[in-house]
From Swiss-Prot:
One of its GO terms (cellular component) is cytoplasm. The active site is at S164, H190, D286. One of its GO terms (molecular function) is protein-glutamate methylesterase activity. The lineage of its organism: Bacteria, Pseudomonadati, Pseudomonadota, Gammaproteobacteria, Enterobacterales. Belongs to the CheB family. Involved in chemotaxis. Part of a chemotaxis signal transduction system that modulates chemotaxis in response to various stimuli. Catalyzes the demethylation of specific methylglutamate residues introduced into the chemoreceptors (methyl-accepting chemotaxis proteins or MCP) by CheR. Also mediates the irreversible deamidation of specific glutamine residues to glutamic acid. It catalyses: [protein]-L-glutamate 5-O-methyl ester + H2O = L-glutamyl-[protein] + methanol + H(+); L-glutaminyl-[protein] + H2O = L-glutamyl-[protein] + NH4(+). Contains a C-terminal catalytic domain, and an N-terminal region which modulates catalytic activity. It comes from Escherichia coli O6:K15:H31 (strain 536 / UPEC). This is Protein-glutamate methylesterase/protein-glutamine glutaminase.
Amino acid sequence: MSKIRVLSVDDSALMRQIMTEIINSHSDMEMVATAPDPLVARDLIKKFNPDVLTLDVEMPRMDGLDFLEKLMRLRPMPVVMVSSLTGKGSEVTLRALELGAIDFVTKPQLGIREGMLAYSEMIAEKVRTAAKASLAAHKPLSVPTTLKAGPLLSSEKLIAIGASTGGTEAIRHVLQPLPLSSPALLITQHMPPGFTRSFADRLNKLCQIGVKEAEDGERVLPGHAYIAPGDRHMELARSGANYQIKIHDGPAVNRHRPSVDVLFHSVAKQAGRNAVGVILTGMGNDGAAGMLAMRQAGAWTLAQNEASCVVFGMPREAINMGGVCEVVDLSQVSQQMLAKISAGQAIRI
């Protein structure tokens, strides 16, 4: 099998050296070239035709976002962004994902060499995922048409959503058309700390419903979406007649925290047939067992189809496990989940 050919663009000579060490330490990939800025990278891309580009967000001569926008228009290819953990860094990274980057890694704030080498396996995994990702599914999405407001639903009704690679844009596409009459939504997207708040704030500006990073103990309200905070699990709990959110530092599940399975299992237990479960694009199997538990508890469950997924890993695993009632294109997810929750459709298996 041929190796994954990687080109790294970073203005830091140290970062270029570290990325080269990391990539070349894995037998299934090789660093074919490095560039100090996008202008040099442009020529190297033509020369080496890499499978994956790693791209620093902030660089002289042309910043990473400008370059990414031009690249995706003229020569689309899988890109993994390398970002700082600053507030500005998280906003720029989310913009990069919107423009077509597949994923991102964050630079440690201290001890760059030790920190990056500790991330070696994670970086390699993201490069492998990017090499296999569907670029056709990751072209910038148009703004979906707002759905008509439906009848006000019981506050017992809610929707649980799980996603990973490619999920930030898929979630935007699902939430943006939702009317204020929508039920509450609980969302777990695999993301490091420092990014989930920026992600929620960005969605809150774009959506009619309220979107926020979830907080421990807060009451779950219709017309609101709650995003699991980075590196914390989110569960649905009860407080008397109301739903509330539980945030905790339990061990990683399926190598993830937050984990989609943790959310889905709690929703199966607390909401049962009053819930709809949705699994979107992502690598791995997180959410498959939890979605089966939701279906067995009477919830209606949807999976995003392969054609519209950046990575058809998590939906495929959920389908194979038998936890999915219906497979739909991303463009139909919002409409279908609202139709099912409004109809109170549920099926026991």
